[in-house]
Amino acid sequence: MDQFDLEKHYAEVNAALGIKNKRSDSDESYVIDLCDEVLGELALRQHTFDFLRGDPSESCPSGKKLPVDAYYPNKNIVVEYREKQHTESVAFFDRRSTVSGVGRGEQRRIYDQRRRDILPQYGIKLIEISYSSFNYYSKKKIIRNRQRDILVVKGLL
Protein backbone atom coordinates (compact mmCIF):
# COMPACT_ATOMS: atom_id res chain seq x y z
CA MET A 1 0.00 0.00 0.00
CA ASP A 2 1.57 3.33 -1.04
CA GLN A 3 1.35 6.56 0.97
CA PHE A 4 -1.66 7.83 -0.99
CA ASP A 5 -3.61 4.59 -0.39
CA LEU A 6 -2.56 4.53 3.26
CA GLU A 7 -3.80 8.08 3.94
CA LYS A 8 -7.05 7.31 2.14
CA HIS A 9 -7.42 4.16 4.25
CA TYR A 10 -6.89 6.08 7.51
CA ALA A 11 -9.41 8.71 6.43
CA GLU A 12 -11.98 5.97 5.73
CA VAL A 13 -11.28 4.29 9.09
CA ASN A 14 -11.66 7.62 10.91
CA ALA A 15 -14.92 8.31 9.06
CA ALA A 16 -16.25 4.84 9.94
CA LEU A 17 -15.37 5.43 13.60
CA GLY A 18 -17.04 8.83 13.55
CA ILE A 19 -13.76 10.67 14.20
CA LYS A 20 -14.02 14.11 12.69
CA ASN A 21 -11.35 16.66 12.00
CA LYS A 22 -12.84 20.04 11.16
CA ARG A 23 -10.03 20.98 8.77
CA SER A 24 -10.08 17.61 7.01
CA ASP A 25 -13.85 17.97 6.48
CA SER A 26 -13.45 21.41 4.88
CA ASP A 27 -14.03 22.21 1.21
CA GLU A 28 -10.34 23.14 0.98
CA SER A 29 -9.31 19.68 2.14
CA TYR A 30 -11.85 18.04 -0.19
CA VAL A 31 -10.53 19.95 -3.23
CA ILE A 32 -6.90 19.24 -2.35
CA ASP A 33 -7.76 15.55 -1.93
CA LEU A 34 -9.10 15.66 -5.50
CA CYS A 35 -5.91 17.40 -6.66
CA ASP A 36 -3.83 14.70 -4.92
CA GLU A 37 -5.70 12.06 -6.87
CA VAL A 38 -5.48 13.84 -10.23
CA LEU A 39 -1.77 14.64 -9.81
CA GLY A 40 -0.93 11.24 -8.31
CA GLU A 41 1.00 12.87 -5.47
CA LEU A 42 0.17 13.81 -1.90
CA ALA A 43 0.46 17.54 -1.35
CA LEU A 44 2.46 19.10 1.43
CA ARG A 45 -0.42 20.95 3.07
CA GLN A 46 0.03 24.35 4.69
CA HIS A 47 3.61 24.28 3.41
CA THR A 48 5.81 27.35 3.87
CA PHE A 49 8.78 28.66 1.91
CA ASP A 50 11.57 30.83 3.35
CA PHE A 51 11.11 33.30 0.49
CA LEU A 52 7.34 33.81 0.93
CA ARG A 53 6.69 35.98 3.96
CA GLY A 54 4.05 38.20 5.48
CA ASP A 55 4.58 41.73 6.67
CA PRO A 56 7.16 42.35 9.41
CA SER A 57 6.06 42.82 13.01
CA GLU A 58 7.75 43.44 16.35
CA SER A 59 7.67 39.73 17.18
CA CYS A 60 8.81 38.67 13.69
CA PRO A 61 10.90 41.40 12.02
CA SER A 62 11.48 39.36 8.85
CA GLY A 63 7.77 38.55 8.51
CA LYS A 64 6.08 35.25 9.27
CA LYS A 65 6.30 32.57 6.58
CA LEU A 66 3.06 32.52 4.59
CA PRO A 67 1.56 29.05 4.16
CA VAL A 68 0.23 27.77 0.87
CA ASP A 69 -2.73 25.40 0.83
CA ALA A 70 -0.96 22.64 -1.11
CA TYR A 71 2.52 22.20 -2.57
CA TYR A 72 3.43 19.38 -4.98
CA PRO A 73 7.25 19.34 -4.94
CA ASN A 74 7.64 16.74 -7.71
CA LYS A 75 5.57 18.90 -10.05
CA ASN A 76 6.62 22.30 -8.64
CA ILE A 77 2.96 23.30 -8.31
CA VAL A 78 1.15 25.20 -5.57
CA VAL A 79 -2.63 24.95 -5.36
CA GLU A 80 -4.55 27.62 -3.49
CA TYR A 81 -8.23 27.02 -2.78
CA ARG A 82 -10.23 30.23 -2.81
CA GLU A 83 -13.15 30.27 -0.41
CA LYS A 84 -15.66 33.11 -0.46
CA GLN A 85 -13.58 35.24 1.94
CA HIS A 86 -11.00 35.61 -0.84
CA THR A 87 -13.50 37.37 -3.09
CA GLU A 88 -16.01 39.02 -0.76
CA SER A 89 -16.12 40.49 2.71
CA VAL A 90 -16.96 38.02 5.49
CA ALA A 91 -17.44 39.63 8.91
CA PHE A 92 -16.15 36.57 10.80
CA PHE A 93 -12.83 36.59 8.92
CA ASP A 94 -12.45 40.33 8.43
CA ARG A 95 -13.05 41.62 11.96
CA ARG A 96 -9.47 41.24 13.18
CA SER A 97 -6.91 43.97 12.72
CA THR A 98 -3.46 42.98 11.44
CA VAL A 99 0.19 43.80 12.08
CA SER A 100 0.16 45.78 8.82
CA GLY A 101 -2.49 48.15 10.12
CA VAL A 102 -5.02 47.11 7.47
CA GLY A 103 -8.15 45.02 7.84
CA ARG A 104 -7.90 41.25 7.49
CA GLY A 105 -9.75 41.28 4.15
CA GLU A 106 -7.26 43.77 2.69
CA GLN A 107 -4.32 41.83 4.12
CA ARG A 108 -5.69 38.62 2.56
CA ARG A 109 -5.81 40.35 -0.84
CA ILE A 110 -2.24 41.61 -0.40
CA TYR A 111 -0.94 38.17 0.59
CA ASP A 112 -2.85 36.45 -2.24
CA GLN A 113 -1.20 38.86 -4.68
CA ARG A 114 2.18 38.30 -3.03
CA ARG A 115 1.83 34.56 -3.72
CA ARG A 116 0.91 35.33 -7.36
CA ASP A 117 3.97 37.56 -7.75
CA ILE A 118 6.63 35.61 -5.84
CA LEU A 119 5.97 31.91 -6.49
CA PRO A 120 6.57 32.16 -10.28
CA GLN A 121 9.87 33.97 -9.59
CA TYR A 122 11.02 30.68 -8.03
CA GLY A 123 9.74 28.54 -10.88
CA ILE A 124 6.64 27.42 -9.00
CA LYS A 125 3.36 27.30 -10.90
CA LEU A 126 0.44 28.70 -8.89
CA ILE A 127 -3.02 27.29 -9.59
CA GLU A 128 -5.94 29.00 -7.87
CA ILE A 129 -9.16 27.01 -7.59
CA SER A 130 -12.29 28.91 -6.60
CA TYR A 131 -15.36 27.50 -4.89
CA SER A 132 -17.29 28.99 -7.82
CA SER A 133 -15.73 26.39 -10.16
CA PHE A 134 -18.01 23.83 -8.49
CA ASN A 135 -21.71 23.58 -7.80
CA TYR A 136 -22.25 25.14 -4.40
CA TYR A 137 -24.90 25.95 -1.81
CA SER A 138 -26.03 29.50 -1.10
CA LYS A 139 -23.46 29.67 1.74
CA LYS A 140 -20.72 29.06 -0.86
CA LYS A 141 -20.05 25.49 0.31
CA ILE A 142 -19.42 22.89 -2.38
CA ILE A 143 -22.22 20.46 -3.20
CA ARG A 144 -19.99 17.42 -3.32
CA ASN A 145 -20.27 15.09 -6.27
CA ARG A 146 -16.94 13.33 -6.57
CA GLN A 147 -17.31 12.22 -10.20
CA ARG A 148 -18.29 15.68 -11.40
CA ASP A 149 -15.78 17.46 -9.15
CA ILE A 150 -12.82 15.34 -10.26
CA LEU A 151 -13.56 16.42 -13.84
CA VAL A 152 -13.58 20.06 -12.73
CA VAL A 153 -10.20 19.63 -11.03
CA LYS A 154 -8.72 17.81 -14.05
CA GLY A 155 -9.77 20.76 -16.21
CA LEU A 156 -8.13 23.27 -13.87
CA LEU A 157 -4.87 21.42 -13.35
Predicted regions and their residues:
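Nucleic-acid endo/exonuclease domains
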Residues: 1-157
